[in-house]
Amino acid sequence: MYQRVLLKVSGEVFGGTKGGLDYEAITEVAKQIADANELNINIGVVVGGGNIIRGIDADRFGVLRTTADYMGMLATVINSLALQSVLEEKFGIHTRVQSAIPIASVAENFIRRRAIRHLEKGRIVIFAAGTGNPYFSTDTAAVLRAIEINADIMLKATKVDGVYDKDPKKNSEAVKYDEVSYREVLDKQLKIADSTAIALCMENHLPMMVLDIFVPGNVKNAILGKKVGTLICECKK
């Protein structure tokens, strides 16, 4: 069983089928976190902002890329506050939101040692605003935070059940990997996370597991070491 994990939840998950904030979807994510929290382990969370805005998309409509990325960071703060509220009010779990950009009225500034102290006290820490810098994805931010808090693994929770050799939505013959190496993900350009995030995992020996957040018990089972989704690792065979 993993003792400290970083859960990355894509922003699209929070949008459900409607986009924006789908509170049924957010509650489902919170329930999975609450179930995992019963294992008395340390849990950090990073939420994307794609349900509200994607910086890389806004750039195409005439918004300066750096500005668009900051807009995306603020979107992750909105999602983080929504998740915090549901975790505390519905499930009674103590949480802290730490932001990579100063926003003192609603969140703590990210301070590594304080984050670790919160985790040690059994609080769930939600890391908002990405890395605080434009041109970096929330996947990269999640890997960075996982490394900084000495997480055993990063769980990437999405709407798909793992990593495939081809896009399963476009190709019925796509094959799912149970386990795949960082190098293979990079060499084959498998579209599960950006290359910066994967390279950072590889350099720091951080395993990443890709799973479907909407399968009940998936997060808890992954933490328990059960076979869930796809494991991206050094995979020495």
Show which residues each predicted segment covers.
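C-terminal catalytic "cap/lid" subdomain
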Residues: 1-237
